[in-house]
């Protein structure tokens, strides 16, 4: 990965970027793999933490009556970064491989929480009504599972859809979701792949359940929230964040 180009066995691609050992590099270089937008830091709100750095080199971790060196535990767990704070004071930092203090590291589903918080801010500002149906804001979702779902259903993850959150990667709808986001290459063995994430969300199949009847963890719901946020605010998601 340091050479240009790297040997084939070291090349990070859309086929392997979420697999070990390629994740060491890919998780801090996502912007070199898939389209992203940077979120600017507000320097006026930057917090400079007090520091009292402690050497944890001799700290031992006991597991099944065996004592392990703490640093070795971090390395054996393939930890990219580790930080300890106590009462607002930074007491320990650890970085490994390609991760540096200022490296933008992928946060995966933590972004769901951030998206929900942003939705809450817009609700507080009376820019979004949680009891409105999704299709009232996004007409493109008419005829889909989202058509008569309320925005509150989307937030609560109880939209009645046929989406399958399958991290084994075997479910057809999950494969199509991944490729629609640009995370994976399209599976040419599948018919009717989608032309981007908006196209995928505009074709979400409905289940036989009622909205609100059952909790259903569904990552596309958070993507849809991002779309709703952009539509009601007339701003790009990353700029609002």
Residue spans of the language-model regions?
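Soluble non-cytosolic domains of exported or imported proteins
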Residues: 64, 79, 105, 109, ...
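Active-site helix/loop module of the DD-peptidase/beta-lactamase fold
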Residues: 106, 124-167, 206, 233-241
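Catalytic-site signature segments of enzymes, centered on catalytic residues
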Residues: 101-102, 167-169, 178-241
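N-terminal core-entry segment
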Residues: 84-89, 95, 152-156, 167-171, ...
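Non-transmembrane alpha-helical segments in soluble domains
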Residues: 71-74, 120, 135, 152-156, ...
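Active-site SXXK
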Residues: 88, 106-130, 154, 225-229
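Short linear capping/connector segments at secondary-structure termini
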Residues: 96, 101-103, 133-140, 172-173
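N-terminal leader/targeting segments and the immediately adjacent pre-domain N-terminus
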Residues: 1-99, 128, 156, 160-162
């Amino acid at each position: 990965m340091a050479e240009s180009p790297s040997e084939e066995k070291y090349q990070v691609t859309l086929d392997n970027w979420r697999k070990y050992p390629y994740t060491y590099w890919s998780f801090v270089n996502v912007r070199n793999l898939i389209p992203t937008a940077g979120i600017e830091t507000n320097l006026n709100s930057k917090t400079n933490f007090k520091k009292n750095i402690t050497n944890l080199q001799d700290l031992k971790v006991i597991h099944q009556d065996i004592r392990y060196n703490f640093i070795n535990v971090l390395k054996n767990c393939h930890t990219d970064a580790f930080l300890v704070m106590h009462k607002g004071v930074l007491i320990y930092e650890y970085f490994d491989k390609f991760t540096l203090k200022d490296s933008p590291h992928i946060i995966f589903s933590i972004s769901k929480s951030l998206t929900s918080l942003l939705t809450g801010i817009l609700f507080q500002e009376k820019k979004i009504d949680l009891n409105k149906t999704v299709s009232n804001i996004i007409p493109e979702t008419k005829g889909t599972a989202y058509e008569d779902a309320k925005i509150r259903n989307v937030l609560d993850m109880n939209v009645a859809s046929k989406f399958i959150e399958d991290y084994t990667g075997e479910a057809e709808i999950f494969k199509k979701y991944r490729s629609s986001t640009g995370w994976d290459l399209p599976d040419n063995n599948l018919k009717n792949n989608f032309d981007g994430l908006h196209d995928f969300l505009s074709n979400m199949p409905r289940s036989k359940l009622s909205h609100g009847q059952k909790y259903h963890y569904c990552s596309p719901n958070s993507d849809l929230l991002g779309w709703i946020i952009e539509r009601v605010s007339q701003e790009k998601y990353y700029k609002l964040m």
